[in-house]
Amino acid sequence: MGLLRIMMPPKLQLLAVVAFAVAMLFLENQIQKLEESRAKLERAIARHEVREIEQRHTMDGPRQDAAVDEEEDIVIIYNRVPKTASTSFTNIAYDLCAKNRYHVLHINTTKNNPVMSLQDQVRFVKNITTWNEMKPGFYHGHISYLDFAKFGVKKKPIYINVIRDPIERLVSYYYFLRFGDDYRPGLRRRKQGDKKTFDECVAEGGSDCAPEKLWLQIPFFCGHSSECWNVGSRWAMDQAKYNLINEYFLVGVTEELEDFIMLLEAALPRFFRGATDLYRTGKKSHLRKTTEKKLPTKQTIAKLQQSDIWKMENEFYEFALEQFQFIRAHAVREKDGDLYILAQNFFYEKIYPKSN
């Protein structure tokens, strides 16, 4: 290459560089078009599958037994926060759905927007509550919490979620955008080609690693109110805490994912029977691993921890962790280094009037 440069006149060298740059831009544009076409095809296939189910429902008539069996009339919503081991957990649900007889559906929003329009909120609530063919149903997607009660529904879905240490989540997401993961290694990522480390980004004050990027887990739990997405809002954090306690069945943490799965299996065996063994022994137990990820230095972590945004997100994480560990402490016992689910610990007595 060096010899060719010496032999080529300067004008030809310039033309060669320009031609190469144009070719690269053209190639990137074609790749982008292919990815957009693939996404459109996936959406078309999904719509076709939904139409087929609805047509079968129309031909066969509505299910008469939908309200009879309470165990079948269950919907779980996992409004998954990005980069919290959500793919690993979701794949357990997919692996168990045929065996445990329930449906799994991915909520695919345009450009992964976690906030739905008002009209889409109405459609979503109606779909979830009346689509009896998909019950029992496990819905998952990157959407913020939606309060079904304000839409007047009689039976609300069961919300679950998993959160992660805020800085670890941001670091994982930073490298994921650049290098992807081992789940779909060939897929081109939005920031592919950017070799800058997370440490370098923080040192330079880059936008992709700014403290504002930490603000995600709080708004996901806070919901669809505008204040939820106001970065650094104390009201948003208080609302997120309220929802976590009052509206979520169980919220686990990435760092203790196996215990989260164990508790779900004990409490909701209709969906999660066999989940713990599958997580421990299955080939998908740690399905998605971000590639090329480099741990940040202590200096980088210390700099992020000076931010009020980190302090709030970390307070919320610690709040969720404390609640999860409280629930676990009352549900399991440790023996020889292993955890065991407690058997039923209540019974009924002094039942009157006495039967003859």
Curated annotation (Swiss-Prot):
Q: Which GO terms describe its molecular function?
A: 3'-phosphoadenosine 5'-phosphosulfate binding; heparan sulfate 2-sulfotransferase activity
Coiled-coil positions: 24-51
Query: Cell inner membrane: is it a keyword of this entry?
Result: no
Tell me the residue ranges located in the Cytoplasmic compartment per UniProt: 1-11
This chain is glycosylated at: N108, N127
| Outcome following mutation: R288 to A/T | Severely abrogates catalytic activity but does not affect 3'-phosphoadenylyl sulfate substrate binding; may be involved in polysaccharide substrate binding specificity
Identification of the protein by name = Heparan sulfate 2-O-sulfotransferase 1
User: Which source organism?
Assistant: Cricetulus griseus
